[in-house]
């Protein structure tokens, strides 16, 4: 199903009374408003963008299949710029989820595989523990995408249960991720899905690590990220020395995966739910309480990682509460993220605030301070979205693109773009 919608609104990025260290400039605009089923409705995760500028994502409602709630079982969507460019996007529903046994209501970001293939996971599956799927583009223009079930999680003790966050893809085409439950101790896992050796073969799941809580982290709250050297990094929401979470690494040593707690977190940085790569091996992360932190690798082999809070905005005007991991790093080293609640506007009818798009600008000299900016306070009014959630994309020219769960022209959510 296709819809064409023109850019509906250009919005001011600022409003009076924000607590800022510097004046933000730029423009935030709604570039697409989702519509009622059978189209895609309520995007619960951020988008990804192809080299040609096509936007892909998931919604946990909408589509053609009923029986999963009031607004159907969810979709994978595609938003294609018109040719020649006119500011319009054409929506195509690539796949409508079929129900809980076949997967339903996805709430995580997609990841690109080879030749434009898309991977993600959805709730449900054969055992009700989540299912990883593959979407293969058509062989010729105008054809249909093909959905294939990659793996249905079985839960403990066989493997993980309830994947969290998005998947990551390695150089070998393997998919990596984390589950909140499951594994040998039912406290979460990190897993690898290895593609088949030949067409038509079966993917193989390997539990790389089962969290156990003995000084270790437990219950990962987000997916993992994979470095160029193959090291896997992630976070747990609980466990560690103080019980408030960890930053961990997994490295292949002599043919076996070895887990290392890089940092046991403290009350100042607790219950993390996502990481992103920064420059020179630095990791940036976030917590549900709107804390942005930095994990610095040791200067010398055998040294300790250092974690420090870059910003703690919980409870401050213009900032708020993070629902899903959204952190992204721009080409100039700035950190971007959204808060689902908070901000200065309650015009959407949410007393906790309609959400905000935020930026941390790195210091210009070593030892300097990061500069905090609110780029946009969502309002839910006049086509604006509200309650942003899920990941952001920062383009090469510095635009920031994300989604809101609600709002827009028809109140079924939006795709927004911030232009510096």
Q: For each predicted feature, which ranges?
A:
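Extracellular beta-propeller repeat domains
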Residues: 2-420
